[in-house]
Amino acid sequence: MAKKIIGSLKLQVKAGQANPSPPVGPALGQRGLNIMAFVKEFNAKSADLEPGTPTPVIITYYQDKSFSLELKTPPASFMLKKAAGLAPVGKRNRPKGSTKPGREVAGSVTVAQIRKIAEAKMKDLNANDVEAAMQIILGSAKSCGIEVKG
């Protein structure tokens, strides 16, 4: 018989750097899930990604307090900022887009880079083909203040 699903939880954790401190520990602890088991499994599954890449993960937890993980691709904004070569700034040391998108340009990417990002994100996007996925990524680029050349 299949396990009974109690619920699911969405978190964004840096690849290979999950630890029991907030936000992971409290989110799992209040649901009675084994935090260290999650940390070990997540770090093992995200080992092939570049360390520190923000990785969305969906945790489905069951009645017997077991869980399953589903890793998603990094956010489009992160991939765009990385492709545009934006330098990390601020106290969290993350790349930052334009403070005034549409008026100020933070960086630029090519159509080929947009296509590459769209192909990588294809399984997580609600798009039927790469062209539709590219339009979604173009919208994200515009929101970040990144111009597209070519």
Curated annotation (Swiss-Prot):
Belongs to the universal ribosomal protein uL11 family. One or more lysine residues are methylated. The keyword Ribosomal protein applies. The gene is rplK. Part of the ribosomal stalk of the 50S ribosomal subunit. Interacts with L10 and the large rRNA to form the base of the stalk. L10 forms an elongated spine to which L12 dimers bind in a sequential fashion forming a multimeric L10(L12)X complex. GO terms for cellular component: cytosolic large ribosomal subunit. CDD domains: Ribosomal_L11 (cd00349). HAMAP family: Ribosomal_uL11. This is Large ribosomal subunit protein uL11. The keyword Magnesium does not apply. It comes from Cereibacter sphaeroides (strain ATCC 17023 / DSM 158 / JCM 6121 / CCUG 31486 / LMG 2827 / NBRC 12203 / NCIMB 8253 / ATH 2.4.1.). One of its GO terms (molecular function) is large ribosomal subunit rRNA binding. Pfam families: Ribosomal_L11 (PF00298), Ribosomal_L11_N (PF03946).
